[in-house]
Amino acid sequence: MVHRFYERAPFPGYPPNDSLTALRARAGRSEFVRLLDRAIAGDARIVEIGCGTGQMCLYLARADRVVIGADLTRASLALGAAAARRFGVGRVQFVETDLLRPGLGAGAFDVVYSAGVLHHTPNPRESFATLARLAKPGGVIVVGVYNRYARMPSRLRRLMGRLTGFRFVPFDPVLRDRQADASRRQAWLRDQYLHPEEHRHAAGEVRSWFSDNGVEYLRTFPSVVFGDDSGELFAPAADDWSVETWLAQVGWMWTLGHEGGLFFTIGRRKR
């Protein structure tokens, strides 16, 4: 079902007359993306699981890094590969694979990255277990999923959209931006409000995935520890406590809700 959804509409796609400079400028507006790029070694071997049309792969493929973009959707991979050729990015490869049977070497990667993917699988916990095996001992795993609390504003917007046949979706920053490319707005509408399968997760739940699969928890982004602004994604955060974690997630309804409610959890596979 999810495969057919993205074959019909690859996400997120590329705007007309795009360039590598423009792509990197767009990605660099995200604090998380800048911190991730800074944290990854210049010679790292990286795999992105569920890479879509490959923007993050192209952004990270700099210095001496080798980047593998893996996705189930052939149409998305074709767009990513075409963009790599057009932009002259050589140290990236796109492969068609199923997350549950990835066909990639276990323990082969310094960084395993997956954003906006696990929550669209039938069993996100099982999907994470497969993904975690791809990291080397000591390798870093970065996963982004919808947060149970931060996703609430999007769910309310979806309800309002259904009442109007999605002719009106209130307070959505992408759909409200009339300067944005029409194809981008349509792709965002489909991905955020019309997806056939969606799960939402609390920070503690995702941490349990890590501990159950031999992955040391490092931190979340945004942090669930008040006052934690170290700026080092791969450094362990200070210990948190349950009330603090809950309050932080409630706050994400305002800070992340306008962008879909995605949060990241970072861990290191135990040696």
Protein language model annotation of sequence segments:
Residues 18-43:
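Conserved alpha-helix/loop element of class I SAM-dependent methyltransferases that forms part
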Residues 53-64:
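Conserved SAM-binding loop of SAM-dependent methyltransferases across substrates and taxa
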Residues 66-71:
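Conserved SAM-binding motif I beta-strand of class I
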Residues 88-100:
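Conserved SAM-binding strand-loop segment of SAM-dependent methyltransferases
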Residues 103-111:
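A short acidic, Gly/Pro-enriched loop at the edge of an enzyme's catalytic core
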Residues 125-137:
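A short glycine-rich, Lys/Arg-flanked "PGG" loop and its adjoining helix->strand segment in the class I
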Residues 140-174:
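Conserved class I S-adenosyl-L-methionine
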Residues 182-268:
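Rossmann-like AdoMet/SAM-dependent catalytic core
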